[in-house]
Structures are given as structure tokens and as C-alpha cells.
A protein has these predicted regions:
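N-terminus-centric sequence/structural signature that marks the extreme N-terminus
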Residues: 1-142
């Protein structure tokens, strides 16, 4: 079981208080550390902060989160907990459409699918999950 936490305000500029906001994200991870003792990470942008602790089960080496993906001028960041049962099929479909992957887990597949298809991609997921996905390009938290 992993843990996700964060904050969002479309009118904020959290980077003006970068040290303070990063400290809050780190404290969020400390509170939820029991949910994922193997790895932790944070992400901070002007309007969004994400914190993630991870229990390594799948993709032990390259599954660090929050995970960021960039395609051209479109970039997104995900903090995710769960298991996508149909991830291999979704990943194969995305590869056939030209996507390339740097990791072996389902996190990057969710991120790539979202970036290719938009929020409707979530309807294709078969599994148990909680997702916080920050679309940096349109400054929207999904």
C-alpha cells in the first residue's frame, strides 16, 4: 500500500515559499510513512504540491513517484496507489500507438494513457487505485 497527499490552489504561487512548502510535503510523507516505507518523493509547482510514499511491489527500481512525463510542450505528474490489472494490455495498446516507456510498472502506463487520451483514459483502467494527476500544461489537478 502506498500513500498520496498534497495541496492545490489555482491562485497560489507555492514556489514563493519553496522551502516551507517542501517541508510541508516532507511532513505529509512522514505522517503516511507507515503506508509505504520503501521510497518517498515530492513534487512542487506554483499551484500544486504532491507527496508520495511507496511500498515497492512492482517496478522496484524505476517506479519512483511522483512521476513526471513530458511529451513536447505537454507535461504531467502523477502520484498513484493501486494495481491496474489490465496494465499489460493497456501498455501494449499504447506502444502500438507509438508510446515508449522507461519503466516496467503501471504508473507510467497510466500517465502515458492520460496524456494521449485525456481524462477519459481512466475509464479504461481495471483495478483498484487512487490517483492524483497534475496536468502542468493546463494547470489542472485530476
Amino acid at each position: 500500500m502506498c500513500g498520496i497527499a498534497g495541496f492545490f490552489n489555482p491562485s497560489a504561487d507555492y514556489t514563493k515559499e519553496k522551502n516551507y512548502r517542501n517541508h510541508i510535503l516532507e511532513m505529509m510523507n512522514q505522517v503516511q510513512k507507515h503506508r509505504g516505507p520503501d521510497d518517498e518523493g515530492t513534487f512542487l509547482s506554483p499551484q500544486c504540491g504532491l507527496a508520495h510514499v511507496r511500498l515497492n511491489i512492482i517496478d522496484l527500481v524505476t517506479g519512483h513517484q511522483p512521476m513526471r512525463r513530458v511529451r513536447g510542450d505537454h507535461s504531467c505528474v502523477i502520484a498513484y496507489n493501486g494495481e491496474i490489472y489490465n496494465a499489460p494490455e493497456l501498455k501494449a495498446e499504447l506502444i502500438s500507438e507509438g508510446e515508449q516507456f522507461l519503466t516496467s510498472g503501471d504508473t507510467e502506463a497510466i500517465l502515458a494513457g492520460f496524456m494521449r487520451c485525456g481524462p477519459s483514459f481512466i475509464k479504461k483502467l481495471n483495478g483498484i487505485f487512487a490517483i492524483a494527476l497534475w496536468d502542468e500544461s493546463c494547470q489542472t489537478l485530476h
